[in-house]
């Protein structure tokens, strides 16, 4: 009788241990199932992100980006050439202004030399006439030079904006490619991990079933 009770207690103890093992296995299965569900959700999210990126890439293909960059580069070269021509024209007008000033000084010198022999009144009128004509030329050239400087400044600012835009497009294109590469690699890794975890989970379930059947 005593042996029978001890055997029953031992069997009960062993059964409790097995139940604990099964509980641990069940907890492990639950955790793995939760992890798999999370990975499935992550895969769905990655797929959605890939679709969104594909939509972006479809609407803005690489050829379009390259053509846009080439067009902006051409515009920048045209602006630089125009600025060069404006600078050349400005230098020519400044040279013309210096030539006029030189002619004016030469004319004044002749007038001063002739003033000793000619009527002072006529000399004064000639001086006034030449001064007015010279001032008109100086004002006109100064105004043209100011307009050209302003145009050059505006073109240079526009050229800087175009260069910034090209840099932004290049960075955006680079970022899209990096994101696509990361998502592809992550998706492949998830598939590999899921395959290995599914194999482990199947083995664990099989072992648990075998243990239950033996009991």
Swiss-Prot record:
Identify the keywords attached in UniProt to this record, alphabetized. Coiled coil, Cytoplasm
InterPro entries associated with the record: SIKE (IPR008555)
Q: Where is this region: Disordered?
A: 194-215
Output the GO biological process annotations, alphabetical, semicolon-separated: response to wounding
Keyword hit for Coiled coil:
yes
* Location of the protein in the cell: Cytoplasm
Q: Where is the composition biased (Polar residues)?
A: 197-215
Q: Which Pfam families match?
A: SIKE
Kindly list any coiled-coil regions of this protein: 5-104, 161-185
Which terms in the GO cellular component ontology are assigned?
Answer: cytoplasm
As for family, the record states: Belongs to the SIKE family.
Tell me, what does this protein do in biology?
May be involved in wound healing pathway.
Task: State the name under which the record lists this protein.
Answer: FGFR1 oncogene partner 2 homolog
- The source organism is Pongo abelii (Sumatran orangutan)
């Amino acid at each position: 009788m005593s042996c029978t009770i001890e055997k029953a207690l031992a069997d009960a103890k062993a059964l409790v241990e097995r139940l604990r093992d099964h509980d641990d296995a069940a907890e492990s299965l639950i955790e793995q199932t939760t992890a798999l569900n999370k990975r499935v959700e992550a895969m769905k999210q990655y797929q959605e992100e890939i679709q969104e990126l594909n939509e972006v890439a479809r609407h803005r293909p690489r050829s379009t980006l390259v053509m846009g960059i080439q067009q902006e580069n051409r515009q920048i070269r045209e602006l630089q050439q125009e600025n060069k021509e404006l600078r050349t024209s400005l230098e020519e007008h400044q040279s013309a202004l210096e030539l006029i000033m030189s002619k004016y000084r030469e004319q004044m010198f002749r007038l001063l030399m002739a003033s000793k022999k000619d009527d002072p009144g006529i000399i004064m009128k000639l001086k006034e006439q030449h001064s007015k004509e010279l001032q008109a030329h100086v004002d006109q050239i100064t105004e043209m030079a100011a307009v050209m400087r302003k145009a050059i400044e505006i073109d240079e600012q526009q050229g800087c904006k175009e260069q910034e835009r090209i840099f932004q497009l290049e960075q955006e294109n680079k970022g899209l490619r990096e994101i696509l590469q990361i998502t592809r690699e992550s998706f492949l890794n998830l598939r590999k991990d899921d395959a290995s975890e599914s194999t482990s989970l199947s083995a664990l379930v099989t072992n648990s079933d075998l243990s239950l059947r033996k009991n």
